Amino acid sequence: SIDAEGLFLRKRHLSVPDHLTWRSFKQGMLVCHQAFYARLDIARDIPYDLQYRHSADVDWCIRVMKETERKHLPLVRVPGVVADFMDGGNTTQNHRASLKERFTVMRRHYGLLTTLTMHVWFIVRSFFR
């Protein structure tokens, strides 16, 4: 992330795996939406679900990756930094609501048991950052 003057603050705590799939997002949002590029034909067919005020980006990325898998298309990792962003956006400002909504998104895509298990891991992982 960067500050208001564009100076580097820190890297994201999550990193993109070499082989990304929609299942990868069980670990958290591994690619920020600012750096997530989708083919236009797929992106046009998958609008943001506006019932989510804070986690529509997570849901959209997962649905795009599911569609990519369904069409047997590759997901390509671009090496290097493709987007810088400032801390303090919508998710940060609405942290509690964002966490609840992200749980709902994960439950929708991965099921309740997996989502609960991963959230226990998120809590444990937070102590080691």
Give, region by region, the residue ranges found by the protein language model.
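Conserved donor NDP-sugar-binding/catalytic core segment of glycosyltransferases
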Residues: S1-R10
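C-terminal, non-catalytic tails of nucleotide-sugar-dependent glycosyltransferases
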Residues: L7, R70-P74, A97-R129
